[in-house]
């Protein structure tokens, strides 16, 4: 029955439960500011 095993190895489900954990965690790497400058903070509500 090696044929059925080959089918399973090619199957890649796209629903959220099968995504690797690092896929969810690595957003910080993308959003990280590499310029080294301090961010300009804009006040949206009065304090």
Curated annotation (Swiss-Prot):
Chief location bin: other
Induction details: Expressed only in the forespore compartment of sporulating cells.
Organism: Bacillus licheniformis (strain ATCC 14580 / DSM 13 / JCM 2505 / CCUG 7422 / NBRC 12200 / NCIMB 9375 / NCTC 10341 / NRRL NRS-1264 / Gibson 46)
One Gene Ontology cellular component annotation held by this UniProt entry: endospore-forming forespore
Keywords per UniProt: Sporulation
Family: Belongs to the SspN family.
UniProt subcellular location: Spore core
Region listing for Disordered, in residue ranges: 1-47
Protein name from the UniProt record: Small, acid-soluble spore protein N
One GO process term, biological-process aspect: sporulation resulting in formation of a cellular spore
